[in-house]
Amino acid sequence: MLLRTAKTVLIGLLLSAGLLAAPAHAASLSGDAWKVAPLAEVAAPGEQVSMPGYNDRAWVGAQVPGTVFGSYVRAGLEKEPTYGDNIYKVDKAKYDRDYWYRTEFVVPTGDRTGKIWLNFDGVNRDADVFVNGKSVGGMRGFMQRGRFDITTLVHIGGRNGLAVLDHLPQGGANSASPSFICSGGWDWMPRVPGLNMGIYKDVYLSRTSDVSLADPWVRTVLLSRARADLSVQVQLADSSAAPVAGVLSGVIQPGGITFSRAITLGPGESRIVTLDAATVPALRVRNPRLWWPNGYGDPSLYTCHLAFRVGGAVSDAKTVRFGIRKYAYDTDGGVLHFHVNGVRVFPKGGNWGMAEFMLRCHGTDYDTRLRFHREMHLNMIRNWMGMTADEAFYDACDRTGMMVWDEFWLNSGGGLPSDVHVFRANAIEKIKQVRSHPCVALWCGENEGDPAPPLNDWLRADLLAYDGGDRRYQPNSHAGDLSGSGPWRNLGLKQYFRNVGNGSNIGDYGMRSEIGTATVPALSSVKRFLPLADLWPRNALWVQHFLGPTATNAGPDGYNGDLEARYGQAGSAADYCAKAQLLNQETMKAIYEGWLDHIGSGASGVLIWMSQSAYPSFVWQTYDYYYGLTGAYWGARAACEPAHIYWNADDDRIRVVNTSLRSFPALRAEAWIYNMDGSQRLHVAGRVASRPGTAVDCFMLHYPLGLSATHFLKLRLTDAAGAVVSENFYWRGTKYQRYAALNDLKRVKLRASSRLTTAGGMDTLRADITNPASSGVVAFAVQATAVRGQADTAILPAFVSDGDFSLLPGETKHLTLQFAHAQAGKGPPRLAVDCWNNAPKFRPAVDTGDLALDRPASASSTDPDGNGPDAAVDGESTTRWSSALGSDPQWLRIDLGKVEPISRVELLWETAYAKSYQIQVSDDGVHWTDIYRTVAGHGGAEDLPDLSGHGRYVRLYGTQRGTQWGYSLYEFKVYGPQATR
């Protein structure tokens, strides 16, 4: 094993001077002075392991906060798990067992009065703690905090030993709860060796006198714009054998609000003290600064500093940050609506599976992620199954106005935890830890299910007891005044604007907790997690990063089919990833715009699955694992702006939606249509007024003659002073969702200039990018990147004011690109500009040759929902033919128009597939010849190569269903021998 030089944590002057009013983390034991070793390889008991000087030279250096497996990766004993298939090759048995953590520390000489406490903010999953040869206690469950009195155990001025025996989470999913239950693997992240066991939060020493404070809570009890009545609660504990009389005092800032109360505690007494505006007039705040969700106002924050003094000396002190706000809810029409500070708000947000799949997200990492969410104009994050537990996450959400839909650690159908009482204790711990955060907007008991008895009743009662009933308790994440979850794959644009009764696959709008699409990142990011040899064509490594059967809910076959049908066959990884960004953008924009289109008429909010990336993958993200901004990011950012002009792709109305607190009485809406050469073909304008919480019509688009096969729609909304309120840009095909003509866009040479400034540790590039008036072509999907070094390496993370935008001839875009100065590296950062028609695109040598595309189709039957046979040959993998339910045989017939040689057929099944079927050909549509037959159909994507036959008609003849339903095909593709398939 790797040897590590012993380190000792030196607890500095704050302890020697007394930590009475210092922040809890001032005497931190976190850092890299720890070591780990498996219990099976350590013969000594905890009493010996925790003695100063114990021989741990053969142990592996560890980082706290962190995990056991993460420590081995950090030490170079395991390859980086995100790259290639490295994580799939790890010997999981090596980590799926109990481990010791160990460190030593010194408490300097000085003030020897009062109590010294050893504090743990979180260990996954159970832990036993030893100090200087003595067991001091333990923790059960990953939310349980540990606070141990070690006053009589530590050697002041000498070395002290600390050992923690960390126990592996046991059982699957709910059985292991409370824990990071998705660490066992999900359809967006691999299984993590050791299931993320480790000391994953901070460890620190604190010092108090006899009375200590815990769990301060500032609550908004009553609220109006002119006044807020607050209550302040804190737990006081006397650890001595004598009564203690003192004064609890507080200061709230801003405002300089002060208050105090004399309190006497009995020997060993622990008491919850609550102060409210009825008894403490200072807690009635006039003209409060309110906390608002992003887009509705500023997320104003206050701090409350509490101290308990005995004889004028501080015994203990705590500071809590809070926001003045009030949540309320209604379920009008059976739809859940959120209200903040008396205003109905529209949640636009995303799900977080985890912050990082190995718990390697800390501190400012959350600030980066939350800034991306704020700049996408999102206002809610669903903390899926409570898998993000860091205080820094909630702090960042508070600062950015990001509401949190917060959950407990249960998955649908997973049964009960192995110890329901440990679960309950952890749930109470979580409530106490996060209840002062204004961002927490809702509590949810279980992912896609109801907590099994007795947990549901316990959670409801404990939230009332410990959170005062201030937030709604929602037992089930997708039922009970919610509109369900899914689909998680991309659909046709029109479907996002249609309700369930109008041919849609999304169901009723309502409040949707999950809906999403596969999201392939840019090539520069793919190169960071796939070896060059595996970049193209798609292969098993793509599947291991979840573009394949590892993530069937993402519809990878449909995603690939749509990409090809809309943008043409991809000839390289670069071509594929470039086309993917366009698909990502138009799909994500349509999801949000489809929901916003129904604001006030059945839609109350939507959370995409997912808005952030915990592992480098091809699915469910807006920015990727490396902070690369995908087309989905730009689609979300465009759609979610507070006042927004958009195109309803289903009925061609131009509309304006308003999810702000501002009214716009006099707006001018304009629409232009341009051909690919930049020539204007249409201009329409109209006046419109927009009120908060509404979507209103501007005008209907009527398309002129002479449009290029792919053309562009530009929208602009200006106020009475002519200032731009919103702009939007779409590409459209004369044939629905067919944009292959973009591959023939004339090359364009853009002009760009930039200037660099540095302030507050941040670099800012201010750029001007121009498409010359003489270009004679639209500059499509322009991207600006800050780069460094000779290799033009992208500087990430970077906050860019716009991306994947388009420029008409003569247009200029003004941009800012901001990033940490430390990220820039050697030499000045530079601006790199590229666009779709600045790079060659793959063009097949011959037509791809789907002979069935848009040909006449007929079928033996069609289901009552009207999924007709033409849908199987429209090149759109989100529409389908469905037969009548429950009968065999059934058939689907295509008329190719003339006799054609046939060498290949591709089938893309919906869930209802054929187990036994034949592919048949005919010259006259009466007499049929089999060219393929099987009794082992498996559904999904079936590629049938090396066929031999000819005919004008091709028929799929199903004789045995694979499910209890009928037959349902997304796509039926037919190829001749000259096709490039």
Name the predicted role of every residue range:
Residues 29, 51, 55-64, 131, ...:
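Disordered, acidic Ser/Thr/Pro-rich linker "stalks" and the adjacent N-terminal cap
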Residues 29, 36-44, 58, 63-67, ...:
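Substrate-binding clefts and catalytic carboxylate motifs of secreted carbohydrate-active enzymes
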Residues 37-41, 75, 96-213, 239, ...:
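Accessory beta-strand-rich segments of carbohydrate-active enzymes
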Residues 70-107, 111-120, 124-131, 137-140, ...:
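Active-site-adjacent substrate/metal-binding segments within catalytic domains
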Residues 164-168, 957-964:
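Short beta-strand-plus-loop segments that form exposed binding edges in beta-rich domains
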Residues 259-287, 676-708, 795-822:
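Intrinsically disordered, low-complexity Pro/Gly/Ser/Thr-rich segments with frequent PxxP/GP/PP motifs
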Residues 285-318, 701-742, 820-847:
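Terminal connector regions
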Residues 380-551, 579, 583, 587, ...:
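Substrate-binding/catalytic cleft of secreted carbohydrate-active enzymes
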